[in-house]
Design a protein with these regions (language model features):
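Classical protein tyrosine phosphatase
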Residues: 117-133
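General N-terminal targeting signals
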Residues: 28, 92, 115, 151, ...
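A conserved beta-strand-loop-helix scaffold within acyl/acetyltransferase catalytic domains
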Residues: 5-105, 136-139, 188-279, 298-301
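Active-site/acyl-donor-binding loops of N-acyltransferases
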Residues: 2, 130-183, 236, 242, ...
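Conserved acetyl-CoA-binding loop-helix of GNAT-fold acetyltransferases
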Residues: 100-122, 280-292
Length: 348
């Protein structure tokens, strides 16, 4: 049986394919999800993004778990999970990725988050899955890895205006604009948006690249199609094809942040590095192209975690170190922690 909720609250299965249910999840996250330490910015996952993030192959609707207030019928809590094969230290384990745990700000004293976690765990166990991977900004005992975010400025003036970046005596506005200028020429001239016909080759290219890491998703072709096929304002994926073969891959997703108190701007448009594979050029050149493509798509900043081989390009490409770190956790699986460069998985 489901876990008991405090008096006046009920469990609710959110149907993200239903416009109204999805809007409720969107509103809950928009007003109550992750903020930076100074409470200036808050993640603003779009409705289309949530549909993409929550409907991967083999997802179970029952794992989109909401809590509603009985009297108002308002959604005040949410958690989600989806199944996938995770390779950890060379062993493939059926796991779930858990995400979007959120409780309304006014109810944080009610201890609803632990109940949401217990309930999603119970429902996952019913499907005979006993392990999970998740990330959090907070420290819990004990992360398998702890990755810092890095930021590549694109729209200098806006990022400074909203307090995301700052100038100093040595870095004036005009110097900053010059410093972060992005060349409009791509290194890989033939980069194009990924198409359906590329799925098989991208599947092979990416899985082959990921196999060197300590933890990664063992993607199926269906998962590759779901996670990488381009969707405007959600996921951007580019491939470099040579003689009919896909040799290089760039992908980044769109996750704006709501600016909580600024007259001039209400949103920072951030591109987040997803999965990138370089075989015909250096990773530096590939990531330089990713930044250029993010600029072409009107993003203000390009963010990347120090996972996979990313860290090797940050200095050359003028990424600045962020404040936040993202901690990776495994549930019910013991293993030694490892360096972020051995992490081959990106959670949204």
């Amino acid at each position: 049986d489901p876990y008991k909720l405090p008096e006046g609250y009920v469990w609710y299965v959110c149907d993200v394919n239903d416009e109204n249910d999805r809007k409720e999840v969107y509103n809950l996250l928009t007003d109550n999800y992750v903020e930076d330490d100074d409470n200036i910015f808050r993640f603003n996952y779009s409705s289309e993004f949530l549909l993409w993030a929550l409907t991967s192959p083999n997802y179970l609707k029952e794992w989109h778990i909401g809590v509603k207030r009985v009297d108002t019928n308002k959604l005040i809590g949410f958690i989600s999970a989806f199944p996938t094969d995770i390779c950890i230290n060379k062993k493939v384990v059926k796991m779930v990725e858990v995400n979007f745990l959120c409780v309304h700000k006014s109810l944080r004293s009610k201890r609803l988050a632990p109940v949401l976690i217990k309930e999603v765990t119970r429902r996952i166990n019913l499907e005979n899955i006993w392990q999970a991977v998740y990330t959090a900004g907070v420290y819990l005992p004990k992360p398998i890895s702890d990755a810092r975010y890095y930021h590549r400025t694109i729209n200098v003036k806006k990022l400074i205006d909203v307090g995301f970046s700052s100038l100093n005596t040595r870095l004036t506005m005009s110097r900053a604009i010059k410093l972060y200028k992005i060349d409009d020429e791509l290194n890989l001239k033939n980069l194009r948006l990924m198409k359906k016909k590329d799925v098989d080759q991208v599947h092979k290219l990416l899985n082959n690249y990921l196999s060197k890491f300590n933890i990664y998703v063992k993607f199926t072709k269906e998962e590759i199609a779901h996670w990488l096929m381009p969707i405007q304002n959600v996921i951007y994926t580019y491939v470099n094809e040579e003689n009919g073969e896909i040799k290089d891959l760039i992908s980044f997703y769109s996750l704006p942040s709501k600016i909580l108190a600024n007259e001039k701007y209400d949103m920072i448009y951030a591109a987040y590095s997803f999965y990138n594979v370089a075989t015909t050029t250096s990773l530096k050149n590939l990531m330089q192209d990713a930044i250029c493509l993010a600029k072409r798509n009107n993003f203000d900043v390009f963010n990347a975690l120090e996972v996979m081989d990313n860290k090797s390009v940050f200095a050359d490409l003028k990424f600045g170190e962020g404040d936040g770190t993202l901690k990776y956790y495994l549930y019910n699986w013991k293993c030694a922690s490892f360096d972020t460069s051995m992490v081959g998985i990106v959670l949204l």
